[in-house]
A protein has these predicted regions:
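Loop-centered beta-sheet repeat module
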Residues: 151-205
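N-terminal signal-anchor module of multipass membrane proteins
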Residues: 13-72
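Hydrophobic cores of alpha-helical transmembrane segments in multi-pass inner/ER membrane proteins
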Residues: 64-80, 128-143, 192-207, 245-258, ...
Length: 336
């Protein structure tokens, strides 16, 4: 990239930087908006999974929840920006515009080409626009936090929702949603889903710990991400939804304990050990999830005990390597 173009690009990104929002009540409004908006997205995903044969049009109750959440998010942003007399075109406005255009194009797409099935809804051009717009809107909530060194609750919810949005886009690689492959003979794909998501969990941990998230904030981050994922089963399998929430609570408590250890130890490789523990715990509680599903269904688990053990120990190795992303390459010390 030519130097002048690079400088111009940086300048344009700086122009999109939003104004800090310090009012705690305004920040709470954004929490409500995010939950409404993105729970709506997961409900729509549930409809595409369990009610796909009944969906014949863009105008469904599930889209109603999603787009009303989007509209509420826009209204909250407009209210807060107007109260602060902030009329700047920032990253949040850009995200809202992109999402709006994506929503309109999605309606046209459904009308002309019908309802997508399988992986198609996650990779169609209109949905990619929706994802981009949503990421930018969440980035707005995150970057307008009162303190650049620490995260408030709205920022933690934003990080958790971004994490959940990544899982939404890659839900075809999510073991909690594709657990059926563990009861078949597609072992390579099954293991891949678990390894991918366990590494993602450890990457999120390494990122979040740099903002000095408290143990309670870490619990919220991961618990909320599991709560989002559980909504995927809301329109077809309440038992599975409750099971995901239960396992997610246990895993999040494990993250809470790991974070407590991280802040109280002087271990020179604490970030690597913590990231490894997060990834391994993800595998451990997923094995518990599999065993419970087997006990509550007619499925027959094809994995032997050492294979299930590998779902716990292999993420441990991957997580340790991910933990190295949190240290300085020159000094080996944790990057603050």
């Amino acid at each position: 990239m030519p130097r002048n173009l690079w400088v111009y690009t940086i300048y344009m990104f700086n122009k999109l930087s939003p104004v800090v929002i310090t009012d705690e009540k305004d920040r709470k409004l954004f929490i409500i908006a995010m939950l409404w908006f993105f729970i709506g997205a997961w409900i729509d995903s549930s409809a595409h999974t369990y009610l796909i044969d009944d969906i014949e049009t863009f105008f469904t109750p599930w889209h109603g929840v999603l787009y009303s959440g989007y509209a509420f998010s826009v209204l909250v942003a407009m209210y807060v920006k107007n109260k602060m007399k902030d009329y700047k075109f920032d990253v949040g406005v850009l995200g809202a515009v992109i999402f709006g255009v994506g929503g309109a194009s999605d309606a046209v797409w459904h009308t002309l080409l019908g309802i997508e099935t399988g992986v198609e809804p996650l990779v169609s051009p209109s949905h990619l626009m929706l994802f981009l717009g949503a990421f930018l809107m969440l980035d707005y909530v995150f970057t307008t936090r009162p303190s650049k060194d620490q995260l408030d609750t709205a920022s933690v919810v934003a990080v958790s929702t971004i994490y959940a949005l990544v899982m939404f886009i890659t839900q075809f690689l999510h073991p909690y949603l594709q657990y059926g492959v563990f009861f078949g003979y597609d072992d390579a794909f099954a293991a891949g889903t678990l390894f991918f998501q366990s590494m993602l969990a450890s990457i999120v941990y390494v990122y979040a710990i740099r903002f000095k998230m408290s143990s309670k904030q870490m619990f919220l981050l991961y618990f909320l991400s599991f709560l989002y994922v559980s909504v995927h089963a809301s329109l077809g399998n309440i038992r599975l939804m409750l099971l995901i929430i239960g396992i997610g609570s246990l895993f999040s408590f494990g993250v809470f304990r790991v974070t407590n250890w991280y802040y109280t130890t002087d271990h020179d490789r604490k970030i690597q050990v913590s990231a490894a523990a997060i990834a391994s715990l993800y595998g451990l509680f997923f094995v518990l999830y599999l065993l419970i599903n087997q006990a509550q269904s007619d499925y027959e688990l094809t994995w032997r005990f050492y294979g299930l053990g590998g779902l716990v120990t292999t993420p441990l190795l991957f997580g340790y390597m991910v933990g190295n992303l949190g240290v300085s390459p020159s000094t080996g010390e944790v990057v603050e």
